[in-house]
């Protein structure tokens, strides 16, 4: 049975913490009947190749659900929600969230709206923070002190709960206001197309955008890049943990000059890794 978190529902949408499969099933049934959802994610991406999805926040017009990704084994069931064309999913800075969702749950989010992209379109300005958009539309100041919080740590603190809930609490209200303005300007579809481009950019393997930037580079440079990416994926570590970009150029120079392989060993400080690299570039 869903239980409200104490002290988190007075004059606000009640918050429900979802950390068991049975509660998760209840939530899935409830949100599958909604037409609009606010969505945000909290994750850790400091020491891994793939993001560690820690929390998914989902809001309806009346409730907020904090889904503990570290406690559930069936998160993939959310894909039916994320891929449902009949449910609008509202984000702020959609690309970062869909990148995490795509690489964590292998889902491509459909029928989404990004209040940040919409606001940039409406104000003809720069991308604005969530706090600034909330202040503009709702005249509320929100606390962003947990921006760099450790979301892998359990139990989640009271401050983290407030922060996470606020990140989705206002999304639907702002979306409805922006939608009215955009429709009056006959610009709603134009903004939706901009948002779809962001979703497409986020819904791909992590190496693809970086590799596209190398389209005019030599084949050996691309081969070295992909070698590092593949090893990083296998070990689930950031590519820079294998060797930094500055050593990328050093290795290419050494290889082009046909220098002794010992120099590659010196750079990588790992004989097995060096042998693997040399073989892959032959």
Features from the language model and the residues they span:
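Acidic beta-strand-to-loop metal/phosphate-binding motif
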Residues: 38, 88-94
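Short acidic catalytic loops
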Residues: 37-42, 114, 167
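Metal-dependent phosphoesterase core characteristic of DEDDh/y 3'-5' exonuclease domains
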Residues: 57-61, 96-153
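N-terminal accessory regions of nucleic-acid-interacting proteins
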Residues: 1-37, 41
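Acidic catalytic cores of enzymes that act on phosphate-bearing nucleotides/polynucleotides
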Residues: 182-282
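Acidic, Mg2+-coordinating catalytic module of metal-dependent nucleases/exonucleases
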Residues: 142-200
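Short active-site oxyanion
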Residues: 64, 84-89
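A short alpha/beta connector and helix-capping loop motif
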Residues: 47-62
